[in-house]
């Protein structure tokens, strides 16, 4: 629980708090432990004030969900976005949210330009209406530590669709979502279209029939903007891959380099929770990259490209995210060296000054790989694997179709946040970054971290009345598309009736 002071502010953690990122005199970063507060029916009322305080004082809130399934994968990748929206709506009406992750990031300007206090919550939920749960979803979630016995015994109950009477003053998940809207904070997600649709149907109101009406509603619900870290990672940070674990670890590493160089960098602090809350807090480790890592025989091409492997923990190849990023960076550096050598030879042959020859691009991240029609429908939920923009070595390219067929046959609906390892309680004594990280609360933290780092990497923002990070403002990633979904209210779209009624309730009772 966040420590509440008399004036309603969140108290800062002590300087010696184990959750604070620190550096030794030798420059080696200590292990960072991220506290994730578990919220269930048995402590929901106790945590309610802290949840509200964290949301209201945050500068932005990152959200993630675990779902009971998604239904027909092919429809979810329909080239017609309107039809795709209808397919996601059908899934949201027939499936449920099993857990909700919230990560609230509050700026601490007195501690640095890019310093945040992060509070992370993992809410276990239980829909009280009939819903579909898919076997592959169950298998995947159990493999990554989801406790279904605990969910059915202690999940916070909720109902979907429209309100049943005046619920605005009750302590419920639906009211918590209403408080998130009232806070008028930027909402951050990763590959967030599915999350947005499920959040609306499960905690807000019945979904509108058209995508235009849905985006018009969203525009009014979140006036500070909706941000998608997959869009930011792929189109602005230009990472080689953009699945969540890769983007998070890449940002961590780049941030560490900037800190070591004395450049502007992101710093985080976490609340120093009392020992009485120990049973409700799950600490997740963020390890610094190993400088001398034993290299296995090979990296798993599937996991490297898509963030998911059908063999899971039984895969004999490496799923080490740091090793994958090391390999990508080495390949990119080799490519730059070869490009410079070609330029030098061409200049020598043409006897030209050192200007860049035509056809040679500037140094930068590896060129994006366009997947187009080769996308397989099973490669989706919060991530569609074929959308991952890897610049694979030749050996990977040759096996790409086989990998995709393997995914089509065996992949569960959740991929973007999937990791290859067993839950933390069964992890090896020498964990690899990413080991057992898959959880709505920690995924929300990773999502928020990526967005905070993108802010740092873009440099000082001009003082204006415009939106935060305008390049990413109200742009939601669309799998298989070169352009994002823009969240805006067009002159041809009206807000839905259910939304208008909800808005009156929201602001009339605030």
Swiss-Prot record:
GO cellular component, one term: nuclear speck
Region (Disordered): 1-23, 332-402, 416-435, 491-510
A Pfam family annotated for this UniProt entry: CAF1
Keywords assigned: Acetylation, Disease variant, Metal-binding, Neurodegeneration, Nucleus, Phosphoprotein, Zinc, Zinc-finger
Basic residues composition bias: residue spans: 336-348
A molecular function (GO) term: poly(A)-specific ribonuclease activity
Coiled coil (residue ranges): none
Record-linked PROSITE patterns: ZF_C3H1 (PS50103)
Superkingdom, natural source: Eukaryota
GO biological process: snRNA 3'-end processing
UniProt xrefs under Gene3D superfamilies: 6.10.250.3220, Ribonuclease H-like superfamily/Ribonuclease H
Zinc finger (C3H1-type): 294-322
Annotated disease: Pontocerebellar hypoplasia 7: A form of pontocerebellar hypoplasia, a group of related disorders characterized by underdevelopment of the pons and the cerebellum. Pontocerebellar hypoplasia also causes impaired growth of other parts of the brain, leading to an unusually small head size. PCH7 patients manifest delayed psychomotor development, hypotonia, breathing abnormalities, and gonadal abnormalities.
This protein's name: Target of EGR1 protein 1
Biological classification of the source: Eukaryota, Metazoa, Chordata, Craniata, Vertebrata
Gene (UniProt): TOE1
């Amino acid at each position: 629980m966040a420590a509440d002071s008399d004036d309603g502010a969140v108290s800062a953690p002590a300087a010696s708090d184990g959750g604070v990122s620190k550096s030794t005199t030798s420059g080696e970063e200590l292990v960072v432990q991220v506290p994730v507060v578990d919220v269930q029916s048995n402590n929901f009322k106790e945590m309610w004030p802290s949840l509200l305080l964290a949301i209201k004082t945050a500068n932005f809130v990152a959200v993630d969900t675990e779902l009971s399934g998604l239904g027909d994968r092919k429809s979810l990748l329909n080239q017609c976005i309107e039809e795709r929206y209808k397919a996601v709506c059908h899934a949201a009406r027939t499936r449920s949210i099993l857990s909700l992750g919230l990560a609230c990031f509050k700026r601490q300007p007195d501690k640095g330009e890019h310093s945040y206090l992060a509070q992370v919550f993992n809410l276990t939920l239980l829909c009280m209406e009939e819903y579909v749960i898919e076997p592959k979803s169950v298998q995947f979630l159990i493999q990554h530590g989801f406790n279904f016995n605990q969910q059915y015994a202690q999940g916070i109950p909720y109902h979907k669709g429209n309100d049943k009477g005046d619920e605005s003053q009750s302590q419920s998940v639906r009211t918590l979502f209403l408080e998130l809207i009232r806070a008028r904070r930027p909402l951050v997600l990763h590959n967030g279209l599915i999350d947005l649709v499920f959040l609306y149907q499960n905690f807000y109101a019945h979904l509108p029939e058209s995508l235009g009406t849905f985006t018009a509603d969203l525009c009014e619900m979140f006036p500070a903007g909706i941000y998608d870290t997959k869009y930011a990672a792929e189109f602005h940070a230009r990472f080689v891959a953009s699945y969540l674990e890769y983007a998070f670890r890449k940002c961590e590493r780049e941030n560490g380099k900037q800190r070591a160089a004395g450049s502007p960098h992101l710093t985080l602090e976490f609340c120093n929770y009392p020992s009485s809350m120990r049973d409700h807090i799950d600490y997740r480790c963020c390890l610094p990259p190993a400088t001398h890592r034993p290299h296995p025989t090979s990296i798993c091409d599937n996991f490297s490209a898509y963030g998911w492997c059908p063999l899971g923990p039984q895969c004999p190849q490496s799923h080490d995210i740091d090793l994958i990023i090391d390999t990508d960076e080495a390949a990119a550096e080799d490519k730059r060296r070869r490009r410079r050598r070609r330029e030098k030879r061409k200049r020598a042959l043409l006897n030209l000054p050192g200007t860049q020859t035509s056809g040679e691009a500037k140094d930068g991240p590896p060129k994006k790989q366009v997947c187009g029609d080769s996308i397989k429908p099973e490669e989706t939920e919060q991530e569609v694997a074929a959308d991952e923009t890897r610049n694979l070595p030749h050996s990977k390219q040759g096996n790409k179709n086989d990998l995709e067929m393997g995914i089509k046959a065996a992949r569960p609906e959740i991929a973007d946040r999937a990791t290859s390892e067993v839950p933390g309680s069964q992890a090896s004594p020498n964990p690899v970054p990413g080991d057992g990280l898959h959880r709505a609360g920690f995924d929300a933290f990773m999502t928020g971290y990526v967005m905070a780092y993108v802010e740092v990497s873009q440099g000082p923002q001009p003082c204006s009345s415009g939106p935060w990070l305008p390049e990413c403002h109200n742009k939601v990633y669309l799998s298989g598309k070169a352009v994002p979904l823009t969240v805006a209210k067009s002159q041809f779209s009206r807000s839905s009736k259910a939304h208008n009624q909800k808005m009156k309730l929201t602001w009339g009772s605030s």
